[in-house]
């Protein structure tokens, strides 16, 4: 339960401040001559969060203080440079990182390391190519022997900051790496990665001896909560609105440099675990997810409608449909449901392969050939997606059976036998 009551005016003020930044970003996006855009995307940015609905609970004998709120409805644009969507993405990333980190530290007994990798500041014209190169260089780094031996899983987050005094940009990586707990007891071993060693290796893969600023350290904190709080630093924004909203030139530079780039990557053992996490309907990670605090009964709706540079607020009692939606819970599927889904996907793969074999362009004219080639391309993409999902499901079946919340099979043996994976 929320420990400190919030004033409605403070909730409205916080959303309004964010909305004004969003409007400025939308205007820069619309006015840019350097960005490829569509009228649909421009409109989506301009109208993002125009209507926000919260379910709220009032403090006793108050119609201004609220003790809890939960988002009921919102329209979003999902643009990386929209500050409202940035915040939502950061919250989701924080949940993902916390849950997966807990899984690795509790199930695998791994321990987290923080790594920072930088390059010297660069100009705006160099930013796009520099980020592309950094993404390739970090892959080279983690393929080196010492890193492969030690790093079991790692999350790479790109951040770009700007020096306003000399108008240069500073792209850098924050990395959360997971190592076996014995790593910290072998500081004198050849496989231990020191700061000088990390600097030398990063200079070599980057082919840049000017690099001086790198760091590697154990996640610190007196309590488990303190250590988890440090881990969440990884979820902060890739680019701050105070930087990219400084001018049209800066906005264009950062937008084009970051467009299409993967700014957070889950690697090593996390490459498959993140895929499992994304399709989890079976409670596989439930015990590792942050617990939501119990809320008081939510009784009213706070609706914010953006109009002429302000949010107009209205408060009314929740209707029956809204109450039902708030009370709705999603039931976990069982291990039997998982097995059925696996065989359904196997059947889809078989059907796709059959369709691919049947396509023959030998006697087709140019128009027919183009249609068939496009169909073949789509089928091959579908086949690849099926294969990837099946591999992830096989990983779950062989490694995570104990984590199923609801089980219909009598044993793991029966489960694997039913899936024909013994």
Regions found by a protein language model. Give the residues of each.
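Cys/His-coordinated zinc-finger cores
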Residues: 175
């Amino acid at each position: 339960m929320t420990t400190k009551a919030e004033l409605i005016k403070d909730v409205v003020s916080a959303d309004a401040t964010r909305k004004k930044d969003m409007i400025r970003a939308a205007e820069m996006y619309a006015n840019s001559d350097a960005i490829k855009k569509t009228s649909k995307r421009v409109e989506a940015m301009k109208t993002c969060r125009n209507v926000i609905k919260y379910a709220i609970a009032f403090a006793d004998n108050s119609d201004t203080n609220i003790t809890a709120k939960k988002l009921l409805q919102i329209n979003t644009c999902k643009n990386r440079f929209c500050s409202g969507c940035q915040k939502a993405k950061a919250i989701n990333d924080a949940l993902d990182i916390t849950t997966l980190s807990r899984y690795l530290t509790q199930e695998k007994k791994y321990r987290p390391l923080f790594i920072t990798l930088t390059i010297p500041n660069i100009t705006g014209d160099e930013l796009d190519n520099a980020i592309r190169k950094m993404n390739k260089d970090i892959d080279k780094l983690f393929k080196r022997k010492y890193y492969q031996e030690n790093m079991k899983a790692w999350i790479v987050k790109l951040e770009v900051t700007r020096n306003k005094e000399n108008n240069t940009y500073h792209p850098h990586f924050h990395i959360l790496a997971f190592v076996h707990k014995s790593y910290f007891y072998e500081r004198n071993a050849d496989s231990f990665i020191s700061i000088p060693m990390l600097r030398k290796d990063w200079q070599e893969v980057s082919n840049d001896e000017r690099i001086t600023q790198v760091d590697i350290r154990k996640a610190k904190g007196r309590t488990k909560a303190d250590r988890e709080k440090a881990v969440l630093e990884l979820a902060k924004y890739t680019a701050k609105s105070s930087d990219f909203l400084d001018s049209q030139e800066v906005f264009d530079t950062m937008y084009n440099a970051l467009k299409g780039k993967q700014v957070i990557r889950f690697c090593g053992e996390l490459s498959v675990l993140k895929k499992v996490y994304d399709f989890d309907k079976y409670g596989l990670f439930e015990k590792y997810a942050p617990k939501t605090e119990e809320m008081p009964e939510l009784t009213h709706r706070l609706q914010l409608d953006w109009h002429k540079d302000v949010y107009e607020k209205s408060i009314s009692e929740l209707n029956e449909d809204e109450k039902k939606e708030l009370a709705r819970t999603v039931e976990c599927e069982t291990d039997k449901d998982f097995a059925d889904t696996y065989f359904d996907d196997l059947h889809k793969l078989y059907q796709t392969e059959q369709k691919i074999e049947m396509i023959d362009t030998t006697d087709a004219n140019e128009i027919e050939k183009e249609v068939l080639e496009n169909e073949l391309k789509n089928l091959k993409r579908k086949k690849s997606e099926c294969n990837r999902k099946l591999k992830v499901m096989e990983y779950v079946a062989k490694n995570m059976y104990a984590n199923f919340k609801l089980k219909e099979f009598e044993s793991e043996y029966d489960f694997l036998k039913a899936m024909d994976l013994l």
